[in-house]
Amino acid sequence: EILFYPTAIGWHPEEKAEFGHQQQDAWRTIQRSHSIANGVYVAGVNRVGHEIMIDGTPGIEFWGRTFLSDPFGVIVAEAPDESEQIVYGEVDPSRVEEVRRHWPFLRDRRIDEYGDITKRFID
């Protein structure tokens, strides 16, 4: 099973030097955590390029870096840079079953406790 997670995330040019590495690392970490929590492959797909604002000022720079992580969060394929890429990675369906059996987040979830999840505040 593969979860395709399309994103359009990047940074403003003024933030790149100070926050760029942290932001990109956080994006990769959360995508990989989706793999682990759900026991599936995740294709973290991200837009590339630079968007100029209507007034001509610099807009968001999308960093690309699309990747595929296995059900344990290991990156098995990734785009090498911020250019447009087609990423190919090998998917082993038996790995999904193996990880779910030995790392059973889905099996052990407490769905009976989900009732309040749609509430903004829990009293």
Show where each model-derived region lies:
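A generic membrane alpha-helix/interface feature
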Residues: F19, T57, Y88, D108-R110, ...
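CN hydrolase (nitrilase-like) catalytic-core segments centered on the catalytic cysteine
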Residues: E1-I86
